[in-house]
Amino acid sequence: AAKNFVTYEGRIYGFATPSAIAGNEGLLVRKDWLDKLGLKAPTTLDELYDVLYAFTYNDPDGNGKNDTYGYGAFVEETVSYEIYPGRRFEPLMGAFGVEGTWNMTASNFGLRIHEASYYDWMVFFKKCIDAGVIDPNWQSYKKDDFRAAWKQGKFGVFREQNSAYASENNYSPFDANFPNGGFIVVDAPIGPNGAQSVGPKCQGMSVYAISDDVTPQQGAKIGG
């Protein structure tokens, strides 16, 4: 696959080295909040909505205050060239089959936003916004704000990089704030028509071009 990435009409124009990991993000849920409210881990979109609602209005942290939300997110810088509202919402968008900016299938190639099911996603998104189950600061949060918020227990469901979630810089402050708190990684919710995705897996490539100074013999040796 890496070789095909730099091959055009039978000619190899460089080296392509794939990244080690194609996808390293998952959907996290506060396990202690589920237990506190007597809820099970959600598997469908409807179940997830019920969890988001309960996390927002049923005092999952037990502090007697109305200070939690169901879902948390932030708008990444990549949203300038990716579909809005961005990657943090793709586990929800995936329930409608419209995760990612592009539909890369040969039969339906094109922008996701033009697909009929994208409207269904927007209806669900508006439902969540109107119900107040998404932390309203998602439009202003930067990445550091978003991570500070989940470490402070502001919301109980979010998409996060596994490496960031497992980083001592992140879990140590969370553990200090919530000694009995914890997360589980769950599958993305299954939508009304059976669609499910935490987000597209796009493996990055490092490309090293071959100089014009390379002789055909050297090029053949390099290309293998």
Residue ranges and their predicted role:
Residues 1-224:
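Extracytoplasmic/secretory soluble proteins
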